[in-house]
């Protein structure tokens, strides 16, 4: 229950991982917070979403894993470490309720949710209100605190609120499902086979006639690839997802099912492209990759949204010439998911440009994953509390995992020229951080074997991130 304070409250809408973390950070900063959660309406006592099973805060609907806890060599483990440094509620409760999972951080999900709920309920500056916020938050009146709001409603945002955001932002700025194509680390692409060229050498807005990476296939390779797509196991939609297909965004395996030649007349068409190494031989099909971030470290497979199970995606896509050793920053998928076009709508402190009283946090911003969602809640909570105190703060530097996520969702992503739908949710990965040169020798001056230099580079990037976060916190 909120106690007397010199500050007006901040309102947080949504009691998932992001909203719970945001509320905690605000309260820990000495600012009262009102957390609105619709999953149990006080008037009816009903849980009113399609996927949740309880009314507990920070309920983990799908997996019980926060993925790798290795801060030295794994980007999500680095994000864990940064959040722990900043007093994360989610990480503290996860550590308290972890279960054996090898190098991963997995939790007893009931114990975890109960702990989050208990800590927030017992905090003297937190008030939890069980209600749905239908539509946009109420207008501020100078006393009610609605001038400082965090929207952390997640992939199951209520229809009324989703429609209100859509009305505010305009058609095309809010997506109701994600159609995710795989993303590949540039350094793992074999450029001895692939080449850069835009179709018909057409220049884009940036004046670049070689904006795509092209991976050629002969007929035999194409036929084998189609066989693998058709045979590969597919993920089924959950009952509550109710995700529609539409022709502009069909999974590649669905296109292949419509006919073996469909893909080579669609996203894999070879027209307007010439292999500079063998210009007289025309490829039977071509897979194109498009730059996905401003750093040029990540490239997405154009038109390759897929429901293939993750276990077979890498194996299948490594059949493509030039991608034999591809390392994936993100695998493909198609899910129900409500998220905004953050690069156009949000500033660097995750405020909506059109209505700065509103901040967005969690999956609704276009991050993917439990940890990433909680991380955005952590930052928005700190931003909102700092604003309430009259001392705004900047985001962490982009060399940190936290800062890299903010940079990506607010500006690091490159639009593809085909509308807002090109922005898709992203997990944390080292490709979002400014690159470093792979070290050739270790701290003792010993030569690092070539195959281990990529791993050594990740450790240097993690060390840089934690050092830069310490400087930001100071």
From Swiss-Prot:
Domain of life: Bacteria
Keywords on record: Cytoplasm, FAD, Flavoprotein, Methyltransferase, NAD, NADP, Transferase, tRNA processing
Native species: Caulobacter vibrioides (strain ATCC 19089 / CIP 103742 / CB 15) (Caulobacter crescentus)
Example of a GO cellular component annotation carried by this entry: cytosol
Keyword Transit peptide set for record: no
Name of the protein this chain belongs to: Methylenetetrahydrofolate--tRNA-(uracil-5-)-methyltransferase TrmFO
GO annotation terms (biological process): tRNA methylation; tRNA wobble uridine modification
Heme listed as a keyword: no
NCBIfam families found in the cross-reference section: gid_trmFO, PRK05335.1
EC number: 2.1.1.74
Cofactor: FAD
């Amino acid at each position: 229950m909120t106690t007397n304070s010199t500050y007006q409250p901040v309102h947080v809408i949504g009691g998932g991982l992001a909203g719970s973390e945001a509320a905690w950070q605000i309260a820990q900063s000495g600012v009262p917070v009102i957390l609105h959660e619709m999953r149990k309406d006080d008037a009816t006592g009903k849980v009113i979403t399609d996927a949740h099973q309880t009314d507990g805060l920070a309920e983990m609907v799908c997996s019980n894993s926060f993925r790798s806890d290795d801060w030295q060599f794994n980007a999500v483990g680095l994000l864990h470490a940064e959040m722990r440094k900043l007093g994360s509620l989610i990480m503290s409760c996860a550590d308290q309720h972890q279960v054996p999972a090898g190098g991963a951080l997995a939790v007893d999900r009931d114990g975890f949710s109960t702990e989050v709920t208990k800590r927030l309920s017992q905090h003297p500056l937190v008030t939890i209100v069980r209600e749905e916020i239908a539509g946009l938050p109420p207008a501020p009146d100078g006393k009610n605190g609605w001038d400082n709001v965090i929207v952390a409603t997640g992939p199951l945002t209520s229809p009324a609120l989703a429609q209100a955001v859509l009305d505010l932002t305009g058609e095309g700025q809010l997506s109701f499902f994600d159609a995710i194509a795989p993303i590949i680390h540039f350094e793992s692409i074999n450029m001895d086979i692939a080449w850069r060229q835009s179709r018909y050498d057409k220049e884009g807005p940036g004046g670049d006639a070689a904006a795509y990476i092209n991976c050629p296939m002969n007929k035999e390779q194409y036929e084998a690839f189609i066989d693998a797509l058709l045979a590969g196991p597919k993920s089924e939609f959950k009952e509550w997802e109710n995700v529609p297909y539409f022709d502009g965004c069909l999974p590649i395996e669905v296109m292949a099912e419509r006919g073996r030649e469909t893909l080579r007349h669609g996203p894999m068409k070879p027209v307007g492209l010439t292999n500079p190494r063998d210009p007289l031989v025309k490829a039977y099909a071509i897979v194109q990759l498009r730059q996905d971030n401003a750093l040029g470290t990540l490239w997405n497979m154009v038109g390759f949204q897929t429901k293939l199970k993750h276990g077979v995606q890498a194996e299948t896509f490594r059949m493509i010439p030039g991608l034999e050793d591809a390392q994936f920053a993100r695998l493909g998928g198609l899910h129900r998911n409500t998220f905004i076009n953050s690069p156009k709508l949000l500033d660097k402190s995750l405020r909506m440009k059109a209505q700065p009283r509103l901040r967005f946090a969690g999956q609704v911003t276009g991050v993917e994953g439990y940890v990433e969602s909680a991380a955005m809640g952590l930052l928005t909570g700190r931003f909102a509390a700092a604003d309430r105190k009259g001392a705004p703060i900047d985001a962490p530097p982009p060399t940190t995992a936290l800062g890299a996520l903010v940079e990506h969702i607010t500006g690091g992503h490159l639009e593809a020229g085909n509308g807002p739908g090109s922005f898709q949710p992203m997990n944390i990965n080292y490709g979002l951080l400014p690159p470093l040169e792979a070290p050739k020798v270790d701290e003792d001056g010993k030569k690092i074997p070539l195959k281990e230099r990529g791993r050594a580079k990740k450790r240097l990037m993690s060390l840089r991130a934690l050092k830069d976060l310490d400087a930001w916190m100071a």
